[in-house]
Amino acid sequence: MSTSPEILRSFIEIYDIEVLRNCFLYLGIDTKSNQIIEFVIFGARNDLRALCRYLRSLKGQIGFNNLNYDSQVCQFILNNSQVWLELEYTADQITEEIFKFSQETINRSDVGFPVYSEYKLYTKQLDLYKMHHFDNRAKVQSLKGLQCNLNWKMCQEMPID
C-alpha cells in the first residue's frame, strides 16, 4: 500500500459500505466539505448508475479494511454494472449478485489475496486497517472492536445479513 504525501493529498473521501442479502448501501464523507454522499440499491431505489459515475470520478478513498473488502465490492460493481443495466436487472437481482460476491470476498480473506490487486482498483485507497497494522495476527482487530476499546458512545453489530 502506497502512502506517499502526494497520494495522501489527493484523497477526498472517507467511506464505508454495507452489504445485506437484499440491500447495498454506500456512504461517503467528502473530506473538504463534510458533505455526506449516499447511494442505495434496495427495492424501488436503484442508484447503480449514479454510484458508478461517482466511483469513477474519485481521486481516492480512505476506509477501514477497504483494500480487502469495500474496494473489492465496489470494483466488482463497476466491472458488472454495464451488463446488469443492459439486461435490466432489478435492484433485488443486483443486490443478490453483490451479496454473493461479498460473501466470497469474506471467505477468501482467510486464504490470502483479494480478487482485484490494488493497482487494478478504480481509485487509490488508504486502508487504516493496514496502516495501523491491524492485519498483523498479534494485533488483529475489527472496527467494532476498536469502537468498544475506545469507549465509543454506540457500538452495535447488525443482527441480520
Segments from the language model and where they lie:
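Metal-dependent phosphoesterase core characteristic of DEDDh/y 3'-5' exonuclease domains
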Residues: 24, 32-34, 67-161
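Conserved catalytic core of nucleotide polymerization and phosphodiester-bond processing enzymes
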Residues: 2, 15, 21, 32, ...
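Nucleic-acid-processing active sites and adjacent nucleic-acid-binding tracks
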Residues: 34-53
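Two-metal-ion RNase H-like nuclease active-site motif
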Residues: 9-19, 127
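N-terminal accessory regions of nucleic-acid-interacting proteins
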Residues: 1-10
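Short, well-ordered alpha-helix to beta-strand connector turns
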Residues: 9, 58-59, 122
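Acidic beta-strand-to-loop metal/phosphate-binding motif
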Residues: 59-67
